[in-house]
From Swiss-Prot:
The lineage of its organism: Archaea, Methanobacteriati, Methanobacteriota, Methanomada group, Methanococci. This is Ammonium transporter Amt1. The record marks 158, 309 as: Twin-His motif. Important for optimum substrate conductance. The chain crosses the membrane at residues 12-32, 51-71, 88-108, 112-132, 152-172, 192-212, 223-243, 261-281, 305-325, 338-358. Involved in the uptake of ammonium/ammonia (NH(4)(+)/NH(3)). Transport is electrogenic. It comes from Methanocaldococcus jannaschii (strain ATCC 43067 / DSM 2661 / JAL-1 / JCM 10045 / NBRC 100440).
Amino acid sequence: MFEVKHMDGIDVFFFMWAASLIFFMKAGFIALEIGQFRAKNVSYHCVLKLLDLAAVFIAYLFIGYGISYGFENIMPLITGTFDADLGAWWMKMVMFAAAAVTIITGGVAERIKILPYFIGALIVGGILYPIVEHLVWGGGFANLGINFHDYAGSGAVHLFGGLVGLMAAYVLGPRIDKYINGKPQAIPGHNIPIAVLGAFILAFGWYGFNIGSASGIANGVELASVAMATTMALAGGIIGGALSSRNDPLYTANGMCAGLVAVCSGVDLFTPIGAFIVGLLAGIQQPFTYKFIEEKLKIDDVCAIGPVHAMSGLIGVICAGIPFLLKADAVSKVSITGQIIGAIVIALIAIVGGLIIYKGLDLTIGLRVSEEAEKVGLDTAILQTTAYSEE
């Protein structure tokens, strides 16, 4: 049975600090995503982002945490009779759940209906993600004898969230005019600077995401090592994105995020140079992965969650088991076989679960907005508003 470790008051504050930064990452997700698509759908997308946050908080309280760490903790959480240890742990972990679920909007932007999206967020945040969380951090893999290391969620959060989002986008189908005679067409974003700003907000919050994955505040060497590895992966991601895209601003900004995604798994184990290499690889692969998803799989991945989250998460999980990227005293702690098995299991849960959830919603209440609403713009057609004044 999973037990939350005892925390001193300073550890509780440390977890609240981390949870606050992870919560603020939501602002980064919103800005990064809305900048990458058309202005006529911006306000609608903001509503989706707000609703998935509420959905996860509700679902994770009543069922998700129980699946992850044991249902004996549910009643204390619901009734407010929990101790500081449980409350602090729940606050941090619900933010991880919210991060995993909110990735999905990047793949389904500009065409999904509000109600099925909200229901999907409830199911993913309350059931599907907690299954993965139990395996990774709740003792599931360990009980099965699988040595899987995922310190801050390259696999549990990003590989999972990216693949679920791709499955939702696959079920939805591409946006109108995305493919003409089977060939993908560029649909430019309306505000690249706000997307880049969003990437910076995400990077700021990522320090809480990674450093906050420590068991407490006492081990200063661990915290400093995690912070340094995070910083070097960020740099590698930027350079990789710039090199592979010939300085395209979106790929460069997304490269920063890709590097941060990839470093999460082994951020406590990588050397600074190892972290840089991991970030570099994640940044470089973006345009090639995006092209494969767009041209071969025919999935309209609006905000590149495939390369930024799914593929970068996979790279991070695998790299956490490669000895030459790790500190000398870390090599014995991980197994490349365990990393590969863990990645396969997470991917299967995300792909199969995502297809079942979103295909089920599509067959029952319908996933997609009308063709007319999509052409007019969801802000005007559904919300009767606009994101920007015409004056």
